[in-house]
Design a protein with these regions (language model features):
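Alpha-helical linker/hinge and terminal dimerization helices associated
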Residues: 17-18, 39-61, 67-68, 265
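Flexible hinge/capping segments at coil-to-helix
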Residues: 61, 132-174
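Hydrophobic hinge/microswitch elements
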Residues: 108-115, 120, 179-236
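Beta-alpha-beta core module
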Residues: 135-141, 146, 207-257
Length: 278
């Protein structure tokens, strides 16, 4: 147990020692400063590394490894996460894989709640996203470039085509992921989000999207990367005849270095990407 005055004194001494202001204090209360957010991100990494050392060399009972990824809805991100846990999970761990909205991914990495983010940019949103990356001291590292595809139900009337056009898709419901309060086209997870469509359905998760694809003969525009082991054979990817590239990659904070688990996860991602390209 520690008293409030003692805690306040310790924080002020830490601020003095580190020569930074961790908290901003006003008559409305106390909140983290920008330097404070970065400091806590570093501190979190140090504590996690210390736990790993104790767990490895002192056989500390109950010591948990922690690791968090925020990502758009990509099956290869899940595949790599599975591999990471199988190889490094051990008996105790606390890992998080968050399939979430684009802005949340950026915010999670910027505030070091997630070590790694996974998202894409294209010619349309590149300038806006990279400006946000720079403002938040984030670094984007490209994993691969994907050509546009659509996900369809395997029984869809267009499923047998070698490729499809936007005009051919027009009669069918278009599905996309909700982007919450930041629903600008620049944050859309789907390329060609500015195209006007007569039938639109927005969802929050991949399972619902796939169920609606099957139930309504809908479609969504995507990278074309799908794993039948995870998603079954009822969803297929068909090339879309429309010019555009999706640059899919990793988002990390420039003020941190990847942990051992982060490095292992990136290696697992790269193995899957190599398999896609090979």
């Amino acid at each position: 147990f520690i008293t409030q005055p003692s805690l306040t004194k310790m924080v002020r001494e830490l601020e003095k020692e580190m020569d930074i202001q961790i908290f901003e204090r006003t008559n409305k209360g106390v909140h983290l400063s920008k330097d404070g957010e970065i400091f806590l991100g570093y501190a979190r990494q140090v504590l996690e590394q210390a736990d790993l050392l104790e767990s490895r060399y002192k056989k500390k009972a109950g010591g948990k490894q922690e690791f968090t990824v925020s990502t758009q809805h990509y099956s290869f991100a899940v595949n790599a996460f599975v591999d990471l846990i199988k190889e490094y999970g051990g008996d105790t761990y606390d890992f998080s894989l968050q399939e979430t909205q684009t802005y949340t991914i950026i915010d999670d990495v910027a505030h070091m709640r997630s070590e790694i983010g996974i998202l894409y940019y294209n010619d349309f949103n590149k300038a806006v996203l990279h400006k946000i990356f720079k403002a938040n001291d984030l670094e984007f590292r490209e994993l691969f470039v994907a050509k546009p595809h659509v996900f369809l139900n395997s029984d869809h009337p267009l499923a047998g085509r070698k490729s499809v056009t936007m005009d051919e898709l027009a009669p069918y419901p278009y599905l996309s992921y909700i982007q919450g309060d930041h629903n600008a086209f620049y944050f859309s997870e789907e390329i060609f989000s500015t195209v006007v469509r007569s039938k639109n359905i927005r969802v929050t998760d991949r399972a619902t999207l796939f169920n609606l694809l099957i139930g309504l003969n809908g479609y969504t525009v995507c990278s074309g990367v799908i794993d039948q082991k995870l998603n079954g054979a009822s969803i297929i990817a068909v090339p879309l005849r429309k010019e555009g590239d999706m640059h899919i990659g990793l988002l990390t904070h420039k003020q941190t270095h990847l942990s051992r688990l982060g490095q292992a996860y990136v290696a697992a991602l790269e193995r899957y990407i190599k398999g896609l390209q090979g």
